[in-house]
């Protein structure tokens, strides 16, 4: 199902739609307007550590905090799990990638985001993958960043289909 809402502002009619595709493991967000508008697409919060914005593509990386002291089963014996001292080895890593398509106007990437100027429509497609392997392996085995990027590439390939096919 697609969630949509329409409203008007300054004599312009806006429609915003959001759809999450389970087969493609991604999100599609669309904004359409009866009049040109400008918007800055950027990502904040959510434990993001690095952001990279290009003209129509963005990549995010981060680590969700983990908890030491949880009981896990290792070699069929319960034991307490403690994260290593190195911050980059603590928690669940994630990588997100997305693309931005504009109708009309122009797009400019900067360190702050992707600025879309004088557009009548915007579509953002985004997928995120994590190092989480499941509760039974959550703290003893995680996907490597290379494995995450491989799964993410497959998701983005599926997500590149026309909207109606998702």
What are these regions (language model features)?
Residues 1-166:
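Aromatic-residue-lined binding/catalytic grooves and analogous aromatic/hydrophobic interfacial grooves
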